[in-house]
Amino acid sequence: MANQRIRIRLKSFDHRLIDQSAQEIVDTAKRTGAQVCGPVPLPTRIERFNVLTSPHVNKDARDQYEIRTHKRMVDIVQPTDKTVDALMKLDLAAGVDVQIALG
């Protein structure tokens, strides 16, 4: 796997969970002899919602909710075959979305 790069993007609603998963990926890649860049924190996406509390009147009474989507990126430079096998066997938390791109 000469001159290749694996880019792993992680998404989660819980920042502790995503940091733990990113650290597991970095530890696994370093243990198998690959160079690692990251984890790089990407901008957090914040979605805000305003909901009327009253079904009829009182337009001023509202509840505010938000969803934060945290993102991290890990680049693995010059991965070995052992690195790819170890990453495939890695069991991450259920609340983390993983996207892998080869470049």
Curated annotation (Swiss-Prot):
PANTHER family xrefs: 30S RIBOSOMAL PROTEIN S10 FAMILY MEMBER (PTHR11700)
InterPro entries xrefs: Ribosomal_uS10, Ribosomal_uS10_CS, Ribosomal_uS10_dom, Ribosomal_uS10_dom_sf
Function: Involved in the binding of tRNA to the ribosomes.
Keyword Protein transport found: no
Name of the protein described by the UniProt record: Small ribosomal subunit protein uS10
SMART domains hit by this protein: Ribosomal_S10 (SM01403)
Gene coding for it: rpsJ
Source species: Psychrobacter arcticus (strain DSM 17307 / VKM B-2377 / 273-4)
Highest classification ranks of the organism: Bacteria, Pseudomonadati, Pseudomonadota, Gammaproteobacteria, Moraxellales
Keywords from the UniProt entry: Ribonucleoprotein, Ribosomal protein
